[in-house]
């Protein structure tokens, strides 16, 4: 191997580094591949340096001969650029090769860009413990409740270039599930897009409740719901916010999966209905009241289809909501009304008055049509008691009036307080319910044996967020 071959290899190596830098600037998923290229290039450089030492020992006078004047018509600046880009030259042409110092500088630059991309994403998470005592569970009463690990979660948020990223994965005791995962882009100061699994824009956002247990609307799928599609957030000025969204399906296309965070229609047994092709429109007016605070009032519309796997036919579903969300000093007041309806195309013999929904690994039946009313009140506190720096006390009330045959009203009320202490956030909730799922009921809106009975649950959730 002569010096001509050596400098050509160094030139090709320099061109590969240039290509890697250009490619790294374009796509984030290639960072791992680029790091591998860096390691390969470093190995080649070490080998070439060893060979160079051998050649120098064999050369007379210790100096290498200068390259001859190129005679090929491809010579000159254009050809040198081609060599730098990694193109192969004729054996008779010996372009200027990058020095080891220059190559090290290119590698260092590439690693810096990769580190910048990695540091643009911020990682966090939470570990939560939960204590529960239930008066409708004899075992729970005999044990005086149960205390266990409730959740471990990891989330990532940040920006890479002009693209926003946000994702969260959760592990519960009996299942794991995606919470959300989307990429976003701001077209301008007014319009932002989220593509992926995002929060459905419906009713009071981000939550129509204050406690850990959420409001009754959560268990109907109308609070903190996440589906897969595209959402646009439009803020033409400080007085208005609009949402426009299309969701192809829930966060999981597998409708038989009960292990999920959001409540959706799920399939099982003779209930084979699933959600598809959903449109959402939401508008909210922000009012500033002198001497009092702020008042947000809004309207929401949700329209979609219900696909039945048995009949292969599509039914309709819709929901409309009006809401008010007021913040007067340390007080927050929420008022919301919802009307919803599912019109499934079931086979003969399957009751159309109830549909099967589910999450947290449990399916249940809910009334296919009804009105929902929420009245919530909370007060925030700033305190200085050891590590405790703040908190709130609240009462969240939900009344569900089904509009189908053989049904009964469902009620849920949550009274509690939350405490903030550094990275620790704790909820202390007393939940009471009648004919309400997850509070001793057989479902929501069902006229079952437990319909007229009030049930209670004490729930304490302590989470460390990092």
Residue ranges, per PLM feature:
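Bacterial N-terminal signal peptides
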Residues: 7-16
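N-terminal periplasmic/intermembrane-space "pro-region" immediately following the signal or transit peptide
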Residues: 22-128, 466
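Outer membrane beta-barrel
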Residues: 110-253, 284-291, 374, 407, ...
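Outer-membrane beta-barrel architecture
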Residues: 118-124, 153, 162-164, 192, ...
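Solvent-exposed loop segments that connect transmembrane elements
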Residues: 140, 253-274, 309-311, 343-365, ...
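Detector for outer-membrane/organellar transmembrane beta-barrel domains
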Residues: 281-403, 411, 452, 456, ...
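Predominantly the C-terminal beta-signal and adjacent terminal strand-loop region
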Residues: 420-466
């Amino acid at each position: 191997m002569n010096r001509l071959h050596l400098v050509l290899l160094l030139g090709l190596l320099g061109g590969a580094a240039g290509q890697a830098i250009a490619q790294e600037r374009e796509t984030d998923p290639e960072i791992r591949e680029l790091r591998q290229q860096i390691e390969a290039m470093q190995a080649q450089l070490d080998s070439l340096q060893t060979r160079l030492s051998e050649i120098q020992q064999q050369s007379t006078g210790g100096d290498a001969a200068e390259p001859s004047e190129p005679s090929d018509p491809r010579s000159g600046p254009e050809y040198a650029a081609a060599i730098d880009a990694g193109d192969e030259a004729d054996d008779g042409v010996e372009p200027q090769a990058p020095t080891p110092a220059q190559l090290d500088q290119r590698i260092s630059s590439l690693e810096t860009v990769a580190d910048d991309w990695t540091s643009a994403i911020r990682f966090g998470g939470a570990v939560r413990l939960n204590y529960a005592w239930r008066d409708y569970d004899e075992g729970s009463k005999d044990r005086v409740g149960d205390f266990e690990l409730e959740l471990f979660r990891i989330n990532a948020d940040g920006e890479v270039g002009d693209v926003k990223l946000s994702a969260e994965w959760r592990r519960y005791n009996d299942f794991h599930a995606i919470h959300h995962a989307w990429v976003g882009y701001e077209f301008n100061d007014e319009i932002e897009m989220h593509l992926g699994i995002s929060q459905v824009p419906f009713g009071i956002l981000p939550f129509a409740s204050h406690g850990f247990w959420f409001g009754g609307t959560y268990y109907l799928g109308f609070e903190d719901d996440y589906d897969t599609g595209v959402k646009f957030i439009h803020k033409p000025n400080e007085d208005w916010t609009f949402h426009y969204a299309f969701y192809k399906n829930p966060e999981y296309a597998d409708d038989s999966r009960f292990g999920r965070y959001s409540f959706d229609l799920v399939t099982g047994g003779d209930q084979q209905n699933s959600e598809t092709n959903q449109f959402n429109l939401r508008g909210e007016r922000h009012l500033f009241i002198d001497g009092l605070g702020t008042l947000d009032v809004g309207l929401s519309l949700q329209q979609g289809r219900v696909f039945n796997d048995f009949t292969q036919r599509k039914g309709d579903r819709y929901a409309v909501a009006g809401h008010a969300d007021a913040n007067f000093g340390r007080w927050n007041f929420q008022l919301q009304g919802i009307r919803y309806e599912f019109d499934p195309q079931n086979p003969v013999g399957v009751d159309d008055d109830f549909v099967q929904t589910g999450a947290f690994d449990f399916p249940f039946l809910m009334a296919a049509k009804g009105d929902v009313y929420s009245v919530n009140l909370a007060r925030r506190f700033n305190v200085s008691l050891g590590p405790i720096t703040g908190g709130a006390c609240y009462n969240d009330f939900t009344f569900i009036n089904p509009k189908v045959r053989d049904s009964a009203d469902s009620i849920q009320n949550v009274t509690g307080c939350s405490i903030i202490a550094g990275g620790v956030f704790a909820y202390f909730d007393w939940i009471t319910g009648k004919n309400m799922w997850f509070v001793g009921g057989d479902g929501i809106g069902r006229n079952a044996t437990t319909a007229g009975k009030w049930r209670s649950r004490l729930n304490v959730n302590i989470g460390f967020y990092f």
